[in-house]
């Protein structure tokens, strides 16, 4: 049986994408919590069209 292998988004360790991998796509609870903390601290965000438009406006107001 072939398994899909992904890299943990936090530490890049290889993880089997399977229900047996409890924290997938993370390799461990630690990496999962590090990622959650980054989202909570607003170090990560999903870009939107509005974000890009605001960036363009601010750049051109110099």
UniProtKB/Swiss-Prot annotation:
It comes from the Bacteria. GO terms for molecular function: DNA topoisomerase type II (double strand cut, ATP-hydrolyzing) inhibitor activity; zinc ion binding. It holds the Pfam family YacG. Binds 1 zinc ion. Its cofactor is Zn(2+). SUPFAM superfamilies: Glucocorticoid receptor-like (DNA-binding domain). Keywords: Metal-binding, Zinc. GO terms for biological process: regulation of DNA-templated transcription. InterPro entries: DNA_gyrase_inhibitor_YacG, Znf_NHR/GATA. NCBIfam families: PRK00418.1 (NF001638). Interacts with GyrB. Inhibits all the catalytic activities of DNA gyrase by preventing its interaction with DNA. Acts by binding directly to the C-terminal domain of GyrB, which probably disrupts DNA binding by the gyrase. HAMAP family: DNA_gyrase_inhibitor_YacG (MF_00649). This is DNA gyrase inhibitor YacG. It comes from Haemophilus ducreyi (strain 35000HP / ATCC 700724).
């Amino acid at each position: 049986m072939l398994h899909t292998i992904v890299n943990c988004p936090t530490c890049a360790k290889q993880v089997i994408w399977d229900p047996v991998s409890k924290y997938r796509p993370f390799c461990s609870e630690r990496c999962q919590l590090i990622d959650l903390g980054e989202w909570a601290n607003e170090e990560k965000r999903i870009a939107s069209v509005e974000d890009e438009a605001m960036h363009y406006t601010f750049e051109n107001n110099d």
